[in-house]
Amino acid sequence: AQMVAIPTTSGTGSEVTPFAVITDDETHVKYPLADYQLTPQVAIVDPEFVMTVPKRTVSWSGIDAMSHALESYVSVMSSDYTKPISLQAIKLIFENLTESYHYDPAHPTKEGQKARENMHNAATLAGMAFANAFLGINHSLAHKIGGEFGLPHGLAIAIAMPHVIKFNAVTGNVKRTPYPRYETYRAQEDYAEISRFMGFAGKDDSDEKAVQALVAELKKLTDSIDINITLSGNGVDKAHLERELDKLADLVYDDQCTPANPRQPRIDEIKQLLLDQY
């Protein structure tokens, strides 16, 4: 049998990946599955299927695609073959997500339709990148927060994103994830490359300054598509978060996306990342 996948949102990239996510309705645990037998044989990426997608879905799925591109770029499994794909996806998302979000199908414009088409392509490109390079703790955190509090995946991704970038983009004595091709810790350098590629920082700017510029531009992007990037602003009860903190931290640590993250997190660091999102 052949599997033919036709995406109807511009986010997950599932049409070209070996991944699936399941949620246990009883325990509220969300967990990814990975097996190359899950990869479709054919992907039909037709933007006609997303021209009437609601704005909210456009914003959340678009930020999910951005995270796929960012995490695959800084992953310990990234390579010369995946990084260009990640970069093109990042470029398309920065340039088109806001226009795609504000597009009104009731009053169609060529610019809006093109933006939705570009976002659809970007999501699949990001899927191609992370199908080979995998993801990181932005997704680990979002899986567990989303499952526990019932937040849409892309929203949980957006909330965790700036904290994960700051956590990864450090220098000095860093506990890096061991991987044969990842011999020196370079996450800050990788994020800085993205920032310079997008024109957010110049070649004379330090890597630290370039990363700060990238985080600032991502904040502008989430603001432009009306995403509140705090747990408190999305109805999460702090007492509930604190009560489940130990359990959530363990689940994040064990998530299938954690091993490819460039910085290997300790349980106490994961707890702080969870609290910082509030």
Regions found by a protein language model. Give the residues of each.
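A glycine/threonine-rich phosphate-anchoring loop and its flanking beta-alpha core
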Residues: 1-80, 171, 186-197
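Short, amphipathic C-terminal "tail helix"
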Residues: 238-278
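Gly/Pro-rich interdomain helix-loop hinge
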Residues: 155-243
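Glycine-rich phosphate/pyrophosphate-binding beta-alpha loops
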Residues: 11, 124-157, 254-260
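Flexible, glycine/charged-enriched surface loops at secondary-structure junctions
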Residues: 77-85, 102-118, 133-138, 176, ...
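Predominant activation on well-ordered alpha-helical scaffold segments within soluble catalytic domains
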Residues: 63-71, 87-98, 120-124, 138, ...
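C-terminal and late-domain segments of enzyme folds
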Residues: 55-125, 129
